[in-house]
């Protein structure tokens, strides 16, 4: 691994989240207006809570997180949480799970993952509802990363996203190994379209900053949870991708 790339990975492993709102001019107000107008029938519970995608695509627990938080174990099941999938593998917004090969043993592994991303990503049937979102990702974000998935999420009044981490069950052993992977680093972008008072996002026992249009770069390998005690819903855009050199440079220049 090149020195500058190694320094980037080490830096991104040191934080549970980072506010990077100043990186780009984000048209969050326009995107909020557009997604709020989407008909309710398109909104679905994340992961495979309302679908047959696991069986249909023969997904396993090594390359994707498949299960709705709280469906197993002692914690309550997440509730009041729905999403719109704008970019995935199939082009069908009902498919809320995206495979993300996260382990790079060699440069060849990285190139194969990148090739897979470029050949297997489609804008879904809901993308027409937010031309502003599509334009922002095509004209701005694509210069800095190859985007793998895009969700708009809505957490209703009283909604809870149960504490969890987004590491596939069969890949958790990699945390103690030497392989290069993207599980325990800043790996997911979280854009708050509208901040509502008393809605808290907590990563690694730390409350994230929140204000209209704020963009948080987060490590979803850390335990995290969200609760909305406001009477109004909160909307966010969540995405992941493979970083280009331009993004790595931007990050290291703004440490």
Residue ranges with predicted function:
Residues 152-182:
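Conserved short histidine dyad/triad with adjacent acidic residue
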Residues 147-150, 158-160, 186-190, 198, ...:
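Extracellular structured ligand-interaction cores
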Residues 164, 199-202, 218-230:
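Short beta-strand His + acidic residue motifs that chelate non-heme Fe in jelly-roll/DSBH
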Residues 184-211:
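A short beta-strand-loop-beta hairpin characteristic of the jelly-roll/cupin
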Residues 1-144:
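Non-heme Fe(II)/2-oxoglutarate
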Residues 187-192, 215-217, 231-249:
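A short hydrophobic beta-strand segment most commonly corresponding to one strand
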Residues 143-146, 181-185:
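A short catalytic or substrate-binding loop motif that flags glycine-/basic-rich loops and adjacent residues
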Residues 162-166, 173-175, 199-205, 212, ...:
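A short secondary-structure junction signal
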């Amino acid at each position: 691994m090149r020195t500058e790339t190694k320094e980037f990975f080490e830096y991104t492993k040191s934080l549970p989240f980072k506010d990077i709102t100043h990186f780009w001019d984000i048209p969050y107000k326009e995107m909020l207006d557009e997604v709020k107008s989407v008909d309710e029938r398109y909104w679905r519970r994340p992961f495979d809570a309302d679908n047959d995608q696991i069986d249909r695509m023969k997904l396993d627990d090594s390359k994707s997180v498949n299960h709705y938080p709280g469906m197993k174990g002692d914690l309550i099941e997440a509730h009041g949480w729905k999403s719109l999938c704008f970019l995935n593998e199939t082009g069908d917004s009902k498919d809320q799970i995206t495979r993300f090969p996260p382990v790079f043993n060699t440069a060849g592994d990285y190139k194969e993952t990148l090739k897979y991303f470029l050949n297997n990503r489609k804008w879904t049937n809901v993308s027409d509802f937010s031309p502003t979102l599509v334009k922002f990702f095509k004209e701005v974000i694509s210069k800095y990363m190859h985007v793998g998935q895009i969700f708009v999420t809505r957490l209703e009044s009283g909604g809870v996203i149960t504490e969890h981490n987004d590491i596939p069950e069969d890949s958790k052993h990699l945390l103690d190994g030497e392989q290069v992977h993207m599980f325990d680093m800043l790996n997911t972008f979280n854009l708050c379209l509208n901040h509502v008072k008393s809605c808290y996002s907590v990563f690694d026992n730390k409350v994230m900053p929140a204000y209209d249009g704020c963009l948080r770069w987060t490590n979803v390998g850390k335990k995290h949870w969200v609760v909305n005690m406001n009477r109004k819903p909160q909307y966010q855009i969540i995405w992941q991708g493979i970083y280009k050199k331009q993004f790595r440079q931007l990050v290291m220049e703004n440490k």
